[in-house]
């Protein structure tokens, strides 16, 4: 069995490689923007995957097994085209797990200050300064106000 990599939620080298390939396929580097596998972003993604080890193991097991079945090779030795084929097949067969991957990768990627700055969003928490909110039609909330309290007071 592959040796465990410390600091990554106890993922094996093979599992870490699978997650890295998937994250890079989702969000590759583009212009001045970093890839999801950037050294400042990817550790957070691994932590997020470690929050649900069952789903993460299912993802990695499926992809590692598919690589052997399709190409009689370890996923880590596959070329880019072969890796994409394995991951795309996984995407088609496991939509629930793909949603989990998307949440893990995107939520961590958009926490990065470089990414947020490129979107024109101020880095840091929204309070105490807050974000500007467009004026809206507050009368749309009138039915909610009229309804009154719908919760039990404790």
Q: Language model features by range: what are they?
A:
Residues 2-5, 16-24, 33, 40-154:
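Mature-region segments of soluble proteins
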């Amino acid at each position: 069995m592959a040796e465990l990599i410390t600091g990554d939620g106890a993922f094996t080298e093979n599992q870490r490689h699978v997650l890295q390939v998937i994250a890079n396929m989702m969000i590759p580097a583009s212009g001045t923007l970093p890839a999801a596998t950037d050294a400042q972003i990817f550790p957070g993604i691994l932590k997020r995957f470690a929050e649900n080890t069952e789903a993460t193991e299912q993802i990695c097991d499926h992809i590692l097994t598919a690589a052997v079945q399709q190409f009689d090779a370890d996923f880590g030795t596959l070329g880019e085209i072969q890796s994409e084929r394995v991951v795309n097949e996984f995407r088609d067969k496991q939509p629930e797990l793909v949603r989990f991957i998307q949440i893990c990768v995107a939520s961590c990627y958009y926490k990065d200050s470089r990414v947020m700055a490129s979107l024109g969003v101020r880095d840091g928490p929204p309070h105490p300064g807050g974000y500007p909110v467009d004026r809206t039609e507050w009368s749309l909330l009138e039915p909610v106000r009229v309804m009154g309290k719908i919760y039990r007071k404790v």
